[in-house]
């Protein structure tokens, strides 16, 4: 009896490890796609914001969700549209980004408060959290590194495009989520180096 119990915990550990690696690989691939197709990503995020807005309005009209929760959700979507204006360049210190992070916390608080008082099946609660609270911040999070590989578009007075690109515009290291995933990939599966 104890042997089967031990095997069940071991199998659970292996399954969690495989799921974690699969999610990391998927996020890495998604971040690569976002870096490659920033214009399409911006358009997709815009459509996701519109969809989330329609869902919030539908929840207010058909399900009679509280006005405060829907209002904060709609205001959050408006702030997301503001973040989309400078996409793929998202400054982590901009007031718009800080406000969106704060509104995510407020939205979660209001949602937890509402669903603690009103009973809804778990699948419906998960649907609300997915479409109204998680999908858009997740899209912005995955696309944080998308602005690093875009060609330089602004110059300082006295600089020409070529020298700006090769000196000041060039970074020694990449930053963002892709660096983290690359580090994890190299730590788990080190690449072979050719020896001549």
UniProtKB/Swiss-Prot annotation:
GO cellular component: COPII-coated ER to Golgi transport vesicle; endoplasmic reticulum membrane; Golgi membrane
Principal cellular location given in the protein's record: membrane
GO molecular function: COPII receptor activity
GO biological process: endoplasmic reticulum to Golgi vesicle-mediated transport; positive regulation of apoptotic process
Residues passing through the membrane, by range: 3-23, 42-62, 70-90, 97-117, 125-145
Keywords of this entry: Membrane, Transmembrane, Transmembrane helix
Topological category with respect to the lipid bilayer: Multi-pass membrane protein
Subcellular location: Membrane
Keyword set includes Transmembrane helix: yes
Family: Belongs to the SVP26 family.
PANTHER family with a match to the protein in the record: PROTEIN TEX261 (PTHR13144:SF0), TEX261 PROTEIN (PTHR13144)
Name of the protein in its database record: Protein TEX261
Gene behind this protein: TEX261
